[in-house]
A protein has these predicted regions:
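Short, acidic, metal-binding catalytic loop of nucleotide-sugar glycosyltransferases
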Residues: 88-96
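GT-A fold catalytic core of metal-dependent nucleotide-sugar glycosyltransferases
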Residues: 7-8, 130-133, 151-206, 231-232, ...
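A short, conserved beta-to-alpha structural element at the edge of catalytic cores
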Residues: 194-216, 318-325
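Short internal beta-strands
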Residues: 98-107, 198-199
Length: 376
């Protein structure tokens, strides 16, 4: 082989290597986005096929099944927000025997009682409710009350406050159900005999995780837990002597508890990882899952089950898609056609947010509404 031929052969090999490397690089960059687009496109096509625009449903039939108990702690000016959350639970009651448990300051209990009594009339007595006062232990009472946000740490003491109940689904007031409440509750049956609570990871991505980058106290797993949507087996928590474990954590880490009660929960489950069940991010979907890129695969595949408007995303313009869904639920009147006045209203408001990263994922927010309203 001549020297010129040898040079041409080497150049050809180099060219092929460069082309091959470029193709592999492009595939690595492109395929994740393509997979997300495929998942969202699949939901869009499915959503369009299952519910004709003229379809109307009756939500509040009398068939009942397993009891689902949803509990929330309300203080200060959170009453309106909490009532929207409760409304969403009633809308997505499904076949469950729904019980709403309100733990609130005494000065706002009457408003809850009057509103929930009226909603029972509107919905054919489709749920029951009970109202309790906020109670903190005498030791460290003021500190517990002010930890993180007013009354937020009350949730730590629910095994005692609600000593007549076996299990609850605790939710923050800034949450919305976008799927059947039974969809979350079913995870109790998937917990093993040692697990006493269920939560989602605080983040899905190590690069943006809070606990792994900033926490100065122990936390669960690699990314910590978010406690905004928390299944609590109160019986097992009492057997675990949960309440007695709280004060020692507060005393040891009080200077480092940025997220208050959630941090205490993380410390306990760091020490007892066998006691917690971790379910997918679709059960506590936050703006972190979509504000930069979509990083909650379970929501892409099966839609959002519970939306969490943390960091005031329901009340501000930080995330227009989240505010759109909150406004649609806030404006919806119980007893009216949910297809026209909730599903279509949500879709219309979401359509105005498609210039945002979260808004581009609109099908994941309405997917379970369409399923629910078709099959009720």
């Amino acid at each position: 082989m001549t020297s010129d031929a040898m040079v041409r052969l080497k150049l050809s090999c180099l060219f092929l290597c460069v082309i091959g490397f470029s193709i592999v690089t492009l595939l690595c960059l492109y395929l994740p986005d393509k997979q997300i687009a495929y998942n969202i496109g699949r939901l869009s096509a499915f959503n369009a096929s299952i519910l004709p625009s003229s379809h109307s449903v009756q939500l509040f039939h009398t068939k009942k099944n397993e009891e689902v108990v949803i509990a929330a702690v309300i203080c200060g000016n959170r009453t309106s927000q909490a009532l929207v959350m409760i409304k969403s639970a009633i809308v997505f009651r499904g076949n469950s025997d729904l019980r709403i448990v309100v733990i609130a300051e005494k000065n706002i209990q009457q408003e809850f009682d009057e509103t929930l009594r009226y909603w029972r009339l509107l919905t054919n007595d489709s749920f029951s409710y009970e109202i309790h006062s906020i109670i903190f232990p005498k030791e460290h009472s003021d500190e517990w009350r002010k930890l993180f946000q007013p009354c937020a740490s009350e949730r730590l003491f629910l095994p005692t406050v609600l000593n007549h109940l076996d299990s609850i689904l605790y939710v923050d007031t800034d949450t919305l159900f976008l799927s059947s409440v039974e969809d979350v509750w079913k995870h109790f049956s998937q917990m093993n005999s040692s697990q006493l609570a269920a939560m989602v990871p605080e983040h899905e991505d190590m690069n943006v995780g809070w606990y792994n980058r900033f926490a100065n106290h122990p936390y669960y797993g690699k990314l910590g837990l978010n406690s905004g949507v928390m299944l609590m087996n109160l019986t097992r928590m009492r057997e675990f002597d949960w309440i007695s474990r709280l004060a020692p954590v507060l005393e040891k880490y009080r200077l480092y508890l940025t997220w208050g009660d959630q941090d205490i929960i993380n410390v306990i489950f760091h020490d007892h990882p066998d006691k917690v069940y971790v379910y997918p991010c679709r059960y506590n979907y936050r703006s972190d899952h979509c504000m930069y890129m979509s990083n909650c695969k379970s929501a892409e595949e099966d839609g959002v089950a519970v939306l969490h408007g943390s960091r005031s995303t329901f009340q501000t313009n930080k995330q227009p898609a989240f505010r759109a869904l909150f406004n649609a639920m806030s404006q919806y009147q119980l007893g009216s056609d949910p297809v026209k006045y909730l599903l279509e209203a949500s879709a219309s408001l979401l359509n105005e947010t498609t210039s945002t990263n979260c808004g581009r994922l609109a099908p994941i927010f309405t997917h379970n509404m369409r399923l629910m309203f078709q099959t009720v």
